[in-house]
Amino acid sequence: MKLHSKGKLKTLAALAILSVALGMGANTVVAADMSHGADNFYKSDKVKTETVKFKNIYGMEVTGTLFTPRNMEAGKKYDALIVGHPFAAVRQQAANLYATKMAEAGFVALSFDQSFWGESAGTPRGAVLPDVYAENFSAAVDFLGTRAFVDREKIGVIGICGSGGFAIAATKMDP
């Protein structure tokens, strides 16, 4: 392209600078809103939550969160789901999101921290004991079965990532 005047060259240069500046603005990253600290996980006004504790057959205390629909009918028995978190995680991450969504859909849901992780008992912290992890699912079924509003014959499991394998192992060991 042949430019015939310095004016056209200046205009072209100005347009090039403007387009680069606009492009850089489109890629600007905005920091997350941390005004509420790190507790920025999804919550629903349609769901009630309660921290619960129960023991597995090894006598270890397992800590979980029970999710129930706010509009539960007195005397009715509800289908329930146990939600296991991904390996090396805690319930406040993916498991609570799944449990909240299930409670919004009308299920009673229970997420829990595997032994050695989060708020559940066990040392050394972060230990990997698949038999204990599978037992925690069985203990969660037993715990939910004691709730008057849960249909003991209709308790299912959602195992996220590695918890899927532990849930399958639990059904094999404790059908």
Where on the chain are the PLM-derived regions?
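Alpha/beta-hydrolase fold nucleophile elbow
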Residues: F149-C161
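Bacterial N-terminal signal peptides
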Residues: A13-M24
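The serine-hydrolase catalytic nucleophile loop
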Residues: A88-T100, Q114
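Alpha/beta-hydrolase active-site loop
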Residues: A127-A148
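N-terminal cap/lid segment of alpha/beta-hydrolase-fold proteins
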Residues: D33-K76
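Conserved alpha/beta-hydrolase
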Residues: K101-A121
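Short glycine-enriched nucleophile-adjacent loop
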Residues: G164-P175
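Short beta-strand element of the alpha/beta-hydrolase
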Residues: G75-P86
